């Protein structure tokens, strides 16, 4: 069975919307309990990721660019894409960033959850 790119983009958009809306519950439901994030600041657990939303939204807007889906097994997929996002509450208050992201989604108990995400900062002319 081949999986649909748009389905997994839809899941990823739910993660972005949770960051934009400060929705810890949505993020909680989308990330696996053993989630691992790899970011420029280091490794991040599910709890670390949820803590980012403690004071509300962390981005004001985002846009997903070119994307590619690789089916790793019947129950695991890898989604890689580019995104631009305007982050809030950092040293400069608002910073637009270009990212290249790989998220691995696994179906567990008939539900797709994000088990791994790695963000790589790209060069941009903003």
Locate each region found by the language model.
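A beta-strand edge to alpha-helix "cap/lid" segment located at domain peripheries
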Residues: 2-29, 34-126
């Amino acid at each position: 069975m081949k999986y649909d790119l748009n389905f997994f983009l839809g899941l990823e958009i739910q993660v972005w919307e949770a960051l934009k809306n400060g929705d810890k519950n949505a993020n909680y439901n989308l990330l696996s309990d053993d989630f691992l994030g790899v970011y420029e600041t280091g490794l991040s657990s599910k709890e670390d990721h949820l803590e980012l939303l403690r004071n509300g939204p962390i981005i004001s807007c985002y846009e997903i660019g070119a994307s590619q889906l690789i089916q790793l097994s019947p129950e695991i997929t890898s989604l890689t894409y580019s995104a631009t996002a305007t982050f809030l509450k950092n040293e400069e208050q608002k910073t637009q960033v270009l990212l290249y992201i790989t998220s691995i989604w696994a179906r567990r108990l008939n539900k797709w959850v994000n088990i791994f995400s790695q963000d790589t900062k790209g060069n941009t002319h903003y």
